[in-house]
């Protein structure tokens, strides 16, 4: 069903660390971590006339602040209030014109806590090389960190003609896909 959201989510609740944790720190953390998962800076592009499967292309307008959002619970910040927020966030479809993920920082969770809600399209988390954005965030491996994001430059988006030629070349290489 085309109206059924095809994403998965996670909810992580943390104690606020000494020194605090805020939106800017979360954006910086995600920027650092997704540098190692290029798919999180790509979006889906349809091949004209449906001549081939959709392809992944770099999002030349990638904006981290679109994907990392902020919310706050009203006092008292109960678990039930958090669950109600999750119930509002998760059913909304992801924007297919952008990379297919969102992260929400939820402040004001009772007992001096905050939550991170993730929403990721299943195409990013299915398969051998798939990595959920939640796993990227809580990865404790220091070798997975680094400044690759600052040097990333998106590749030019293919033209319609290039997509059609690519789809036709794929059809010649794998004729069983045509049937």
Regions found by a protein language model. Name each.
Residues 9-179:
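Soluble acyl-CoA-dependent acyltransferase catalytic core bearing the H(X)4D motif
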């Amino acid at each position: 069903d085309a109206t059924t959201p095809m994403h998965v989510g996670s909810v992580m609740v943390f104690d606020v660390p000494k020194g605090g944790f805020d939106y800017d720190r979360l954006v910086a953390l995600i920027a650092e971590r997704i540098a190692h998962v290029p798919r999180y800076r790509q979006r889906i592009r349809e091949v004209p006339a449906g001549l081939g499967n959709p392809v992944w292309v770099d999002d030349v307008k990638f904006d981290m602040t679109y994907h990392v959002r902020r919310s706050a619970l009203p006092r008292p910040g109960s678990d039930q209030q958090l669950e109600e927020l999750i119930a509002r966030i998760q059913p909304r479809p992801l924007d297919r014109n952008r990379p297919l993920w969102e992260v929400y920082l939820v402040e004001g969770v009772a007992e001096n806590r905050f939550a991170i809600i993730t929403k990721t399209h299943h195409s990013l988390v299915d398969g051998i090389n798939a990595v959920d954005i939640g796993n990227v965030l809580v990865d404790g491996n220091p070798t997975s960190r680094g400044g690759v994001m600052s040097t990333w430059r998106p590749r030019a988006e293919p033209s319609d003609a290039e997509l059609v030629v690519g789809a036709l070349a794929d059809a010649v290489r794998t004729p069983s896909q045509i049937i």
